[in-house]
Curated annotation (Swiss-Prot):
Keyword list, A-Z: Ribonucleoprotein, Ribosomal protein, RNA-binding, rRNA-binding
Residue stretches making up the S4 RNA-binding domain: 37-100
GO BP annotations, alphabetical order: translation
Keyword Ribosomal protein: yes
Protein name in UniProt: Small ribosomal subunit protein eS4
SUPFAM superfamilies linked to this entry: Alpha-L RNA-binding motif
CDD domains (UniProt xref): KOW_RPS4, S4
UniProt-recorded Gene Ontology molecular function terms: rRNA binding; structural constituent of ribosome
Family named by the database record: Belongs to the eukaryotic ribosomal protein eS4 family.
Record GO cellular component, one term: cytosolic small ribosomal subunit
Keyword ATP-binding: no
SMART domains noted in UniProt: S4
Amino acid sequence: MTHLRRSTSPEWWPVERKGAPWSIKPSPGPHPANSSIPLAVLLRDVFHYAKTLREARLIIGKGYVKVDGKVRRDYKYPVGLMDVIELTPINEYYRIIPDPVNFLRPIRIDKSEAGVKVCRIEDKTMVKAGKIQLNLHDGRNIIVDQDEGRKYETLGSVVVNLEDGKLMDYYPMQPNQYVIAFNGVNVGRHGTLINWVRSFRKRDAIATVKAKDSEFRTVLNYLLVIGKESPVVKVTE
C-alpha cells in the first residue's frame, strides 16, 4: 500500500485527523515507520514552510532539503532520531530529538554542529578481511579494523562526521554517561546514567537515570548515550 490512512498514522504526527482520509506513508529507509516522519509532513505540518503537499513536494524536488548532509528528493523519505535537517535556501539547521509531548521534534542548531551526528551501535558483525562492521541505529554501516572494533560495544554511541563518515568519538553505555530516553513513558528526558539491574539480555535491563528534576527508570534499550558529563550535541532549546 502506497498510502496511509490519517486515522492510523502515528499519534504524534501533527496531521489533521478529520481532513483528507489519506496521509503519506514513509518510504522504506533508515528508520522504522512508527518512529519516523515523512519529509513532506515535516516540511508542511511541522515547519509550516509549505501549505499543501504539492508545495512540499516542489520544495523537496528542487533539492532544497538535506538530511544528514545529503539532498533528499523523496517526499516520503523517513526522518528520525538524531537526523540533521538542512534547509539550504534559508541556511537553517535542525536536529531531530526525542520529545515528551511530540515523541520526536526538530530543534534549531548552529551550522557548526550540523556536521556531526550521534548514532547508537545496534550490532557488530565480522566481515571480509578480518574487519568489523558497526551497524548503527540509522541504518549506517561503518567498517573498522578488528583491533579498533574490539573497543566498540552494542548500545554504545559513536559521533559520526557527516561529511566523510568517519568516527570522531565513542561513548560506551556505562554508569556516569549522559543519556537521553528516546522511547517509553520517559521519552525526551535526559540525565546521568546511574546504573542498571542485570538481566539475561542487557537490552532488557531496567536502568536508573538521574535527571535535573528527579530520577527516573526505563529500559536500557530505550536510552541513547549522548555524552560523558554533558551532551555533545544540543538536545534542548
